[in-house]
């Protein structure tokens, strides 16, 4: 399967300098050993950090507990799935045949993981500021 990179970039509101990073972020382990799992790992941490920073700056009166609860809800699997659905990321996922046949495009864990992987790909492509701007635009 090929990815319509123009459509992807329009959907996520980001223009990649290196389209290989975008392809890597959307490649599930069922499709290739060169997959998005490591990007997902980094993207999870980037997302947590950037959301924490955003909340810290925008809610100066909030307690640590309140900030933690807000962050948890904003980086939850359900929140990431909602972002993936809003961006129609399932259309761009590269999945193996077995995963496709078993409904992988709708699997919440795959959708949430793809959002985290895209965040890391954007970090490598455009830096932390690009990630921050994108995450804010998605919220």
In which residue ranges do the predicted regions lie?
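RNase III-family endoribonuclease catalytic core
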Residues: 1-139
């Amino acid at each position: 399967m090929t990815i319509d990179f123009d459509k992807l970039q329009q959907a996520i509101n980001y223009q990649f300098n290196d389209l290989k990073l975008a392809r890597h972020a959307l490649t599930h382990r069922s499709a290739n050993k060169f997959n998005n799992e490591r990007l997902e790992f980094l993207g999870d941490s980037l997302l947590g950090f950037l959301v924490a920073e955003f909340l810290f700056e925008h809610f100066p009166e909030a307690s640590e507990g309140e900030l933690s609860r807000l962050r948890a809800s904003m980086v939850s699997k359900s929140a990431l799935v909602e972002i993936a659905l809003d961006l129609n990321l399932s259309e761009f996922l590269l999945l193996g045949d077995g995963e496709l046949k078993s409904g992988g495009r709708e699997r919440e864990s795959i959708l949430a993981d793809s959002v985290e992987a895209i965040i890391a790909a954007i970090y490598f492509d455009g830096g932390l500021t690009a990630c921050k701007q994108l995450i804010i635009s998605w919220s």
